[in-house]
Amino acid sequence: MITRAELLDMLASNAPQGFEAQALGLVPIVVETSGRGERSYDIYSRLLKERLVFMVGEVNDQTANLVVAQLLFLESENPDKDISLYINSPGGSVSAGMAIYDTMQFIKPDVSTLCMGLAASMGAFLLASGAKGKRFALPNSRVMIHQPLGGARGQASDIEIQAREILYLKERLNNLLAQHTGQDVERIARDTDRDNFMSSEDAKAYGLIDQVLLKRP
């Protein structure tokens, strides 16, 4: 049977550098040495020990399940210490995003949010939902807000039901975004009518974040 090391060597000799990790879905391993010997962690598990949670990629049920589980675990570890949620996401499912949002508000620790790269749609909503005064973005990140998207097929009555649900979600999200940004609901409704992209400084002025971070404090 081929070993993991042999497989990586084969890939390295036939593919560009770094490709093997992407192709196999591998995650870097961190080795820590103590008086009791060595212990290895995947990089995300090691960062979880520092209370760092990553939400990267599409917001879907799988993403929500992982983020919620980590938030609940960190609360059980220490209910009084802040959690940092790093966001680089184009958005996705409203229901999955609301599962993360409700958990952020439910748990005892403050959840600090930080945008790296892009926080769009539900990603931007969750960015703004962090603890007041603890919402950040890196200088070249982008933020985008818009109204929820949806579509329906079938009988006219079924389409009407789906349309009512989308309108309800739009109103609910606008009210929550107004609460977190300090903007009035009418402005939120206007500004989310179409894709609305912002720089990190624009997002700060709008109230989506509290500070643009150039360097770690």
UniProtKB/Swiss-Prot annotation:
It comes from the Bacteria. Coiled coil: none annotated. Its main location: cytoplasm. GO terms for biological process: protein quality control for misfolded or incompletely synthesized proteins. Gene3D superfamilies: 2-enoyl-CoA Hydratase, Chain A, domain 1. It holds the Pfam family CLP_protease. One of its GO terms (cellular component) is endopeptidase Clp complex. SUPFAM superfamilies: ClpP/crotonase (SSF52096). Its EC number is 3.4.21.92. It is found in: Cytoplasm. Fourteen ClpP subunits assemble into 2 heptameric rings which stack back to back to give a disk-like structure with a central cavity, resembling the structure of eukaryotic proteasomes. PANTHER family: ATP-DEPENDENT CLP PROTEASE PROTEOLYTIC SUBUNIT. Belongs to the peptidase S14 family. Cleaves peptides in various proteins in a process that requires ATP hydrolysis. Has a chymotrypsin-like activity. Plays a major role in the degradation of misfolded proteins. This is ATP-dependent Clp protease proteolytic subunit. The gene is clpP.
